[in-house]
């Protein structure tokens, strides 16, 4: 086989979609000479990263976990969101043996069922339809005490949009004639993923001990008070919902706890606080002996709790296939997206493959990334340039977090700076590749930074989008790019560029035609 250019670098610009509209489009507003030059001189197109094209419901915006799964698998991966929704529609959810075992054990002892999860129609980490179904299931199975501990979104949804979701669940419980919302707290606390354990502690103590900074007699009153304090949904402080004559809800021995987030990365820390016997990240006043703690999906193999929807193994994903062919690969990202470029890109596998190395660059310790829109991109780029110069790797996969993480802040000026930083970083990579004769593919996992304001409300747009994402070839070869590509087509494209045959399990189609 003739030698192919080396290395082949896959650059994933997280949250970097394409919008025809210049309005509140941080990419359009940024000074980006490198990006402009690439689009003027290199083969490029657009590919889809949302909806059915990535195994999500129609019209559902893509996200980082889903995007990286599809990119690495080389096939459309049927997402947990869709699996759970389908199980609810088919009725299988209500007989799920793992959830049923925990609920039935609590019911038999006249104990409570606690439902945890992000109460949101966002569909990124959870969906409120699933929380409604869980409340219905608990009631059907005879639970008299059903409590929802609602984590509020404002990140994958508009910043102040929780009220309809709270009202919907209040109505669900009213219709069941039992159960209620017991607490609300922003996802900033309950769903940390960066080992900021003081945040997780606030959520744990609210749920388990009923310890809250604030109390209110209804969920909507709790939310209104938070807004009056200047908090948006994501940052709502621990609030116990205590109707007149009631007490703050606590988790007691013999209760069942069901965590209804389907995405793993932001559910791990709180889960560990509940179930790890030797948990030491913060002191727990109470560690109740539960009838069961159920993860909706497997948040991590190391968490000692059952999951209702275990992973469906993927074989011959890109990383595995490269290893089988004796190829070397480097995965690199900063903390915020490290799991995506390793665990998710490898189809849900924690361990590196043979010949795979990983570099984790710490994300800056700032409260929100608009305060440092460059994040750790320059340091990530230093290591990539070094790796390209060494010519040790056949493939380098890198994630740049800026577009997504700064996009989520809703701060337009910071998002523009993030894009300008990315442009500089891409310039350094392209220059390094030019010197060694390497190639790159530049794409994204989903959109975000190209829409920074919600046109209908005038609020900051902090969520992902359904826009297509760019696909750019960087190199010396003559090739053409077809239209209609999806994220699942990227891995087959890489194999085409490397001269490797595509395995049968990869059902994606190469986006490029050589020659």
From Swiss-Prot:
Annotated catalytic residues: 64 (phosphoserine intermediate)
UniProt keyword terms in alphabetical order: Glycolysis, Isomerase, Manganese, Metal-binding
Cofactor or coenzyme needed: Mn(2+)
CDD domains the record matches: iPGM
Ligand binding (substrate): 125, 155-156, 187, 193, 263-266, 337
Binding, Mn(2+) 1: 404, 408, 464
S-S bonds: none
Subunit and interaction comment: Monomer.
Role played: Catalyzes the interconversion of 2-phosphoglycerate and 3-phosphoglycerate.
Listed name of the protein: 2,3-bisphosphoglycerate-independent phosphoglycerate mutase
